[in-house]
Design a protein with these regions (language model features):
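ATP-binding N-terminal substructure of ATP-dependent carboxylate-amine bond-forming enzymes
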Residues: 1-122, 126-127, 131-133, 137, ...
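Residue-level detector of anion-binding/catalytic polar loops
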Residues: 36, 120, 148, 213, ...
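Glycine-rich phosphate/pyrophosphate-binding beta-alpha loops
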Residues: 102, 188, 246, 315-329
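Phosphate-binding site of ATP-dependent enzymes
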Residues: 192-282, 303-310
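Conserved metal-phosphate-binding beta-hairpin within the catalytic cores
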Residues: 218, 228-229, 288-320, 330
Length: 353
């Protein structure tokens, strides 16, 4: 019997468009012999809509839809509520596959709704999602388990009342250049690189537009590498290493470099010492366990010329676009996207048994 799988995409975050791209990849690779795929898109304004087909996602016409659909928190129904023509119906749901990036998608908020509904869902739970979305608290946890990472200083929105003092504190702990990041934002939105105090001030004002908590971080010079992980209650598996080769004109691998610059490249299983690859995989698995992760995640690192592996960040709902590293790394391990989707759905179902 087919499982009713609700794929939720879009969202009112800065990564709305990337989410739509990821969703098309996921939907096109779902086995329709196994799954009855139901599409729900969330507009940038926060409207939940029933979507007819993947074609509507590709051409953007789904945003003009009129049939509203949302997950009910009523545990006795475990359903999607569909509102149309003044009436409603309940569509039974077996599993939810969220393809939501950034705020309100991978920060634990929508996962909380899924938990209330008691419907199985793909990916990390509330705790792992919330912690991993917050760069400051992720670094606190990673520091606790003894994995190398860049030096950092936490600046709060309230510190702007005495900004000179806050900048003094940052400069005391971290040498220039300094990366300034919103603590809770994805795809490098609001991230700046400051070479001096004037640029630091501007970077802080830019970051606070995106979040009230800001991470000021030491610049690490090294290769940008990533590892895909897949975990459940019993084990965590990791892939070979991937490397990001940002376009030469990009100051760092920001949103435009990731998604809009054809010069940026990804390399699967790049040339590097085997001990470095093993260290990256071990650290990636350890970090997923430390944040209580489940299902899919991608863990990013820097590899310094000295051979030191430095943690950068964890992404609990990594991109699934045609150029995304997560599915590419699993494919290199012999796991194609349809099989990967099957595993993620099976894991979600098993978690609730």
């Amino acid at each position: 019997m087919k499982k009713n799988v609700v794929v939720i995409f879009g969202g009112d975050s800065s990564e709305h468009d990337v989410s739509c791209l990821s969703a098309t990849t996921v939907i096109k690779n779902m086995d329709t012999e196994k799954y009855n795929v139901i599409l729900v898109g969330i507009t940038k304004e926060g409207k939940w809509l029933l979507v007819d087909s993947v074609k509507d996602i590709e051409d953007g016409s789904w945003r003009e839809g009129e049939v509203k659909a949302f997950i009910s928190p009523d545990t006795t129904t475990r359903s999607l509520v569909i509102l149309a023509e003044g009436t409603y119906k309940l569509q039974k749901v077996d599993v939810i596959f969220p393809v939501l990036h950034g705020m309100n998608g991978e920060d634990g908020t929508v996962q909380g709704l899924f938990e209330l509904s008691k419907i199985p869902y793909v990916g990390c739970g509330v705790l792992a999602s919330a912690v991993s979305m917050d760069k400051v608290y992720t670094k606190i946890i990673v520091d606790h388990i003894g994995i190398d990472q860049a030096k950092f200083v936490h600046v709060r929105e309230s510190d702007f009342e005495h900004l000179d003092e806050a900048m003094d504190r940052v400069e005391k702990e971290i040498p220039y250049p300094i990366f300034v990041k919103p603590s809770c934002a994805g795809s490098s939105k609001g991230v700046s690189k400051a070479e001096n105090r004037k640029e630091l001030e501007a970077a802080l004002y830019e970051a606070v537009k995106h979040d009230r908590n800001i991470l000021c971080e030491e610049t690490i010079v090294g290769r940008e590498v990533e590892c895909a992980v897949l975990g459940d209650r019993t084990q965590v598996k990791s892939t070979c290493v991937g490397e990001i080769l940002a376009a030469q004109e990009a100051a760092f691998y920001d949103f435009d470099a990731k998604y809009n610059n054809a010069e940026s490249k990804t390399v699967v299983d790049p040339d590097m010492p085997e001990e470095s690859k093993q260290k990256i995989r071990e650290d990636a698995e350890a970090i997923l366990k430390a944040v209580d992760g489940f299902g899919l995640s991608r863990v990013d690192f820097f590899l310094e010329e000295s051979g030191r592996v430095v943690f950068n960040e964890i992404n609990t709902l990594p991109g699934f676009t045609s150029i995304s590293m997560y599915p590419m790394l699993w494919k290199a391990c012999g796991l194609d996207i349809p099989e990967l989707i099957d595993i993620l759905i099976d894991q979600a179902m098993t978690r609730y048994r």
